[in-house]
């Protein structure tokens, strides 16, 4: 079983990181091509392209300039400890054990606009390049065109190493679009998290993002390798709802307290 999640816009380069044997990202040759394109952009162009403030645009222009093909512990940080957002609040990686992280290294992947696919302990340098960015490149008008089959092929290879051919989609739609689903020889499960607010169950973005992180944590801590085990997920007050679920979409519901 392999789970996928999205990265976060906010980065954490301050918190302490455990002393692990970190790994190298596999697709940096492609990352370097994107960096070269981004270095040609002015801060004003970056601001317009990414819809971010002038201050953030300046910061990211500097990050593009400072990026190096060589990744080491001086200029990089393990991906799973580098992101800070709702999904990662649910994952709460800082409380996972060394054995948990080693399991995650085999069973979790972070999709990335710059790096394509990252394992939890893969080193990465600070960047901001969301998958939906319309960055023109030699292959087309955006990052979906740039990555083409590359991300799909990397995931297929990782899934085949698991032996069970199951992919758990905990990524956002923006990032999942980078995968060519019809080319994956796997069973894809998409957990959906619904909260009852005002008498109606619906997806509430903030809660759903955190729930994706909770599900990821559950998979890691319980060493989940079977589809039926996913249905036992109960963190955060969510419960599997069979009547709302299908064979590929697992619905989990929760009643919010007033």
Swiss-Prot record:
Instruction: Look up the domain of life of the source.
Output: Bacteria
Source organism per UniProt: Histophilus somni (strain 2336) (Haemophilus somnus)
State what protein this is by name: UPF0246 protein HSM_1789
Query: Known InterPro entries for this protein?
Result: YaaA
One Pfam family assigned to this protein is H2O2_YaaD
Which family is this protein grouped under?
Belongs to the UPF0246 family.
GO terms classed as biological process: response to hydroperoxide
PANTHER family per UniProt = PEROXIDE STRESS RESISTANCE PROTEIN YAAA (PTHR30283:SF4), PEROXIDE STRESS RESPONSE PROTEIN YAAA (PTHR30283)
What HAMAP family does UniProt report for this protein, alphabetically? UPF0246
Q: GO CC terms on record?
A: cytosol
């Amino acid at each position: 079983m392999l789970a996928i999640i999205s990265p976060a816009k906010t980065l954490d380069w301050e918190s302490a990181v455990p002393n692990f044997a970190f790994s190298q990202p596999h697709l940096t040759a492609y990352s370097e091509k994107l960096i070269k394109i981004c270095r040609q952009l002015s801060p004003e162009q970056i601001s317009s392209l990414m819809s971010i403030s002038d201050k953030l645009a300046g910061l990211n222009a500097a990050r593009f300039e400072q990026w190096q093909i060589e990744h080491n512990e001086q200029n990089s940080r393990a991906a799973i400890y580098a992101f800070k957002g709702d999904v990662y609040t649910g994952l709460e990686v800082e409380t996972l054990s060394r054995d948990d992280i080693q399991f995650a290294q085999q069973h979790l992947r972070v999709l990335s606009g710059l790096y394509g696919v990252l394992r939890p302990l893969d080193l990465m340098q600070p960047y901001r390049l969301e998958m939906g960015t319309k960055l023109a490149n030699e292959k087309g008008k955006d990052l979906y065109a740039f990555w083409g089959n590359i991300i799909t092929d990397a995931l297929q290879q990782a899934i085949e190493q698991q032996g069970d051919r199951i992919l758990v989609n905990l990524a956002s739609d923006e990032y999942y679009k980078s995968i060519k689903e019809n080319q994956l020889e796997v069973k894809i499960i998409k957990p959906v998290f619904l909260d009852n607010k005002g008498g109606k169950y619906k997806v509430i973005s903030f809660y759903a993002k955190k729930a994706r992180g909770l599900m990821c944590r559950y998979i890691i801590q319980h060493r989940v390798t079977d589809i039926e085990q996913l249905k036992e997920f109960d963190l955060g007050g969510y419960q599997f709802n069979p009547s709302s679920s299908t064979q590929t979409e697992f619905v989990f519901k929760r009643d919010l307290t007033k």
